[in-house]
Amino acid sequence: MSDIIKEIEEAWQIKENILNDSLKLIKLKSILNESIKSLNQGIIRVCEKQGNQWKVNEWVKKAILLYFITTESQLYNNNYNSWYDKVAPKFPADTDKNIFKEAAIRKVPGAIVRTGTYIAKNVVIMPSFINIGAYIDEGTMIDTWATIGSCAQIGKNCHISGGSGIGGVLEPLQAKPVIIEDNCFVGARSEIAEGIIVEEGSVISMGVFIGSSTKIVYRDTGKIIYGRIPAYSVVVPGVLPSPEAGKPGLYCVVIVKQVDKTTRAKVSINDLLR
């Protein structure tokens, strides 16, 4: 793997001129195809947890961006649609049913998954869009019209509800994508973007919008944080009143309660939100 990383880092330094060197381009394309294959298999990933911290593997992002630079668009077809793209579908129309059986996943009509995406066992993909570099762990459901952005990381046993958006990021290289840790619920029509981390066991209500500048308010103390939802939080949309009379309040999200792991496992999502 160290040799592949070295080759990608060197190619990145000359990316503006890489198309002009046919010999280097042939070698690089082989390396990039192997990298995309490794992303598909979950051997490598854009972002991974080391201890309590998430680390971005910048070289993997560089590999994806170089793949865009060095790949020409082509026409793709399935039984009901055609499109013109640089990135092939992960599951083309002629995918053998045994591949789905062995992978133990379910994919319904209208589900679009680009190559370079890892889909673990027992994942259910409703009509939705999952972009290159995304990582979807075991037992998760990507519900109808949900969008999973490039490089977004979704943990085990999550439910990404209908119409919700999970932001991704390829550039800047050092930026984290959105990370949804294990056993999380993201409510319908919610949007989680700009590198937000939703920690394990959290429940995000319907219609919650969280970006890097969104105030995240603890209801019981009034404390304000940014950038992450603490583990086992229950979050709803809210408004912070203006300190000046007659001025409009501003949108925020509110941590209405935090529960322990045992309670989260026993209590239904609806009960937690109430």
Curated annotation (Swiss-Prot):
The entry's localization annotation reads:
Cytoplasm
From the UniProt record, report the name of the gene that encodes this protein. dapD
- Membrane listed as a keyword: no
The broad enzyme category this protein falls into is transferase
Coiled-coil stretches: none
Protein's GO biological process:
diaminopimelate biosynthetic process; lysine biosynthetic process via diaminopimelate
State the CDD domains in the record. LbH_THP_succinylT (cd03350)
Subunit details: Homotrimer.
Per its record, how is this protein called by name?
2,3,4,5-tetrahydropyridine-2,6-dicarboxylate N-succinyltransferase
Q: What is the lineage of its organism?
A: Bacteria, Pseudomonadati, Pseudomonadota, Alphaproteobacteria, Rickettsiales
Matching entries from InterPro entries are given as:
DapD_Trfase_Hexpep_rpt_fam, Hexapep, THP_succinylTrfase_dom1, THP_succinylTrfase_N_sf, Trans_hexapeptide_repeat, Trimer_LpxA-like_sf
Q: Which reaction does it catalyse?
A: (S)-2,3,4,5-tetrahydrodipicolinate + succinyl-CoA + H2O = (S)-2-succinylamino-6-oxoheptanedioate + CoA
Q: What is its EC number?
A: 2.3.1.117
Q: Which organism is it from?
A: Rickettsia typhi (strain ATCC VR-144 / Wilmington)
What keywords appear on the UniProt entry? Acyltransferase, Amino-acid biosynthesis, Cytoplasm, Diaminopimelate biosynthesis, Lysine biosynthesis, Repeat, Transferase
GO MF terms on file? 2,3,4,5-tetrahydropyridine-2,6-dicarboxylate N-succinyltransferase activity
Q: Binding positions for substrate?
A: R106, D143
Its UniProt pathway annotation is: Amino-acid biosynthesis; L-lysine biosynthesis via DAP pathway; LL-2,6-diaminopimelate from (S)-tetrahydrodipicolinate (succinylase route): step 1/3
Name a GO CC annotation attached to this entry.
cytoplasm
